[in-house]
């Protein structure tokens, strides 16, 4: 099913028992985080806080708190079908012309989907039903203060829209935003992210000139999830959202700039970043489970707030996994696999364990074809997609290992690895500045673990053979297993 806006999606979730309305007065200061966290841990529903303390605007939390709801938001039945989206992205990243008539017929569905990529530009839109310009105050937003040590309320689910001076496509990214004053927030974007790259190019091309920015809150689920999906750099997240939705993304021009924002967003913040204006951001509790260091980031000055009537404020919290970002990571893991397999066909599975903060550790299983193959795959993971430049640990195993089963992975590490021979250490590589374990902010090391069976060129030892029972014996025991009644006998004895 496809959804025109966030409200369509919420109506479906409520009909399926996947949305809970909270009628009691709940404080955005800490209380919403605690309720959302307990609900997420229990794989509970999305939450709509109808009476946030001190505010009239309802707050939506835990929207993507299960992988099932992530799949639903992408218009899919369940998480298993997300690999089809990955196959589509792999095709868009490196499209291949049809090799013949049959191949053309097989590719027609992809070509038809591409027709949904261009934006549909509206002259008026629900997101501009109400306009605040004079004496605007960001305090009208029920922004959550998530953790006791946080310095200020935080806008967490804003889709930041930017455009570089030499680019036609607009970039959508999600960056946390500290509320600084009535009309200013801090834009915490890392140097490699699309918004930061657009801003850097703008400063070079238009020195001293304000950089237009817009932030959309409460867009439709396809647009929200399009902003966190690894789309090719040349493709706009709006275009990919159209593919997800099955029809073109509706946008409207900002009041203060030429940027286009989701027409059905609940709230839009318009404004600019004045080059050189920065402020100290943090500390905040983040997805690692720790409070991060403070650092200076650009300041976004808000000139307009536009919104729908009876707008809904979309929010979340981040903390030690599992949290909502880690659930998103687990779902998007399925999207990454076909993209990696197109470049490295030997990859069988790829897994980012949520407890590894969604991206800091990856387990890869491969069909090994030559000595040193595992190291090539490590290098490929670190370099092929920008999303993995901050992955600190890559474990490569053979395809007889289940990448998603720690018992299998640990067994492979402890039986197939020599620490000196099979550990690859690389120093002075890009690291998330939130990673306080690195010796220098933004720069640290990476480790690759080759837990594959070694070929003759890689060892002088006779390699071990895995133990496996004869099939005939297994068949014989299968035939008499129920007759043995072993477990029922044990339960009778325990009584």
UniProtKB/Swiss-Prot annotation:
Domain of life of the native organism: Bacteria
Entry keyword annotation includes Lyase: yes
Binding-site positions, Mn(2+): 171, 237
Enzyme Commission numbers on file: 4.1.1.98
One Pfam family matching this protein: UbiD
Membrane topology summary: Peripheral membrane protein
InterPro entries reported for this sequence: UbiD, UbiD-like_C, UbiD-like_N, UbiD_bacteria, UbiD_Rift_dom
Subcellular location(s) of the protein: Cell membrane
Substrates-to-products reaction catalysed: a 4-hydroxy-3-(all-trans-polyprenyl)benzoate + H(+) = a 2-(all-trans-polyprenyl)phenol + CO2
Gene Ontology molecular-function annotations: 3-octaprenyl-4-hydroxybenzoate carboxy-lyase activity; metal ion binding
Predominant subcellular localization, coarse grouping: membrane
A single cellular component GO annotation: plasma membrane
Family: Belongs to the UbiD family.
Protein name in UniProt: 3-octaprenyl-4-hydroxybenzoate carboxy-lyase
Record lineage: Bacteria, Pseudomonadati, Pseudomonadota, Gammaproteobacteria, Enterobacterales
Gene name as annotated: ubiD
